[in-house]
Amino acid sequence: MQKREILEKYKKEEERILVAKLLDKIELCEKRNKMEYTDFLDEYKESMLKKVLNLVKTDYICFGGYEEAERKLLIVYPEKLNQVFEENKFNFNTIISVIRINPLKEEIKNLNHRAYLGGLIKLGINREKIGDIIVHENGADIIILKEIEKFLYTNLCTLKRFKNSKIEVVKLENIINKKQEMQECKIIVSSLRVDNVISEICKTSRNKASENLLSERVFINGRIYVS
């Protein structure tokens, strides 16, 4: 299927741009006979691009730094690398890095996922360059593209919220991974308003549910819900 035919399937400009970028990377992969990869994708974008890859029949793998990652890179690669990826011999540390932030104990309680992400955005980092942010009892492990590692390592300490924190770069195999717990819920709601549904699922007030929405803690089909 030709590039133009594929792009015509997508009416939203954001989706067309994303698909076009992927198709460009596939062309580069074939032309240069070397792997190419996207920025970090949320679950919705990953699912959409996988459908494109099924149309063009290109070898690919999705990886976000650890097995349970929600945000992943999509890597397309030439036939010569089939064995490398099939036998898990590729060193992902060459394209993905992890910045560990260890704040002072008395400051940890004031830092949540949004605070860590906000710090990166304040430094001018594009969200797509950032993978999962794993918040743990000692701080956070932030998965990023290798290309921004040096900049973040040098500049994170210039932010007031991190000025007393220990900043270090760690390997993917040393990520402090908190296992996600999944729970299936069956609820009855008076309306399908999102805050109403969240309130019932979390057994909390509508106001608290609205706070979670504003804090970008709610995902629907892999995408942050924006009211």
Roles of regions detected by a PLM:
Residues 1-201:
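Ferredoxin-like alpha/beta domains used as RNA- or RNAP-binding modules
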Residues 188-227:
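A basic, amphipathic helix-loop patch mediating RNA/tRNA/ribosome contacts
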